[in-house]
A protein has these predicted regions:
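Short, charged, surface-exposed secondary-structure boundary motifs
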Residues: 155, 179, 200-207
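Basic, amphipathic alpha-helical segments enriched in Lys/Arg and hydrophobic/aromatic residues
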Residues: 178, 182, 186-187, 207-270
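Short hydrophobic/aromatic-enriched beta-strand-loop microsegments
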Residues: 187-195
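Structured core elements
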Residues: 131-133, 143-145, 170, 192, ...
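Short secondary-structure capping/turn micro-motifs that flank functional sites
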Residues: 58-59, 194, 200-201
Length: 270
């Protein structure tokens, strides 16, 4: 209410009003312009993109689709199932853009000797991905893209890059590709992307040491995603890529607003 300058005596927008506002943003196709305008305002306040940038992606869950095997096969082929065509109301409730992916996580498994070992597990998740680039100095989101949950993270690096006063770029191993290295080199940027282990080979000692140092910096981006999911409760309950993009973009914008409020109090711009 304070953000909207509403008093206790004022009417608070209901859920339908907020939904319609978001829908108007989607149909007008201006959400990226809105995000860019606020980024320009931040720079005008002295919060320039500084010290390099960190790139990463996070899965944003969406309601699971209960589709038959035939419907799944049709969707994979890019077709609309015949049963959906005959039922427009059903078609309107089906998200044909969200996709399944596997989320990697760590778990502790009990061993025979009573100790616990860390094992890697894969958790199926249905939804979209929020790809972002933040600046290292202020941890503000400077660029973003939204894809289906199955999209390859590394392919989105060019889409989330922004102008920065420094040339360093940090990212995990998924972003270490020849195409990305060539892209960074062409723009005069310095790759701090984690080294990838070659098949059948282990990383060298210097590479392991470099990855540990890079992880300490790269981990800052995890705090952005954690804030969106814990403080905002970010999930996608809309249908389709266009609406999902608006929903996620607004979450990125809202994060920057809250981050600016914190920065203004604790780290005033010079």
């Amino acid at each position: 209410m304070r953000f909207l300058r509403l008093g206790l005596e004022d009417a608070v927008p209901d859920a339908k009003t907020i939904w319609l506002y978001r829908e108007h943003l989607t149909r007008a196709g201006v959400i990226r312009d809105l995000f860019a305008d606020f980024d320009g305002w931040l720079k005008g306040k002295g919060y320039l993109a500084m010290s390099g940038q960190i790139v990463d992606a996070s899965i944003i869950a969406a309601p699971r689709q209960r589709n038959s095997d035939a419907e799944k096969a049709a969707l994979k082929e890019g077709r609309i199932p015949e049963d959906w065509r005959a039922k427009p109301a059903k078609l309107a409730q089906k998200d044909r853009d969200a996709r399944w992916t596997l989320k990697r996580a760590k778990a502790r498994k009990s061993k025979a000797d009573g100790t616990k070992a860390r094992v890697e597990i894969a958790i199926p998740v249905f939804g979209y991905k929020n790809h972002i680039g933040i600046d290292k100095a202020h941890r503000l989101i400077r660029g973003f893209s939204v894809t289906s949950g199955a999209a390859y993270d590394g392919a989105q690096l060019p889409a989330v890059m922004a102008r920065n006063t420094a040339s360093d770029v940090w990212a995990e191993t998924a972003y270490r590709t020849r195409a990305n290295e060539a892209f960074l080199d062409a723009r005069g940027l310095r790759s701090r992307i984690h080294f990838r282990r070659r098949p059948g080979q282990d990383l060298t000692r210097p590479q392991k040491k470099a990855n540990r140092a890079r992880s300490k910096i790269r981990s800052a981006v995890e705090g952005v995603f954690a804030h969106q999911k814990q403080a905002f409760g970010l999930v996608v309950r809309t249908i389709g890529m266009a609406r999902a993009t608006t929903k996620i973009a607004l979450a990125n914008l809202a994060y920057n607003v809250r981050r600016y409020i914190w920065l203004a109090e604790h780290q005033p711009a010079a």
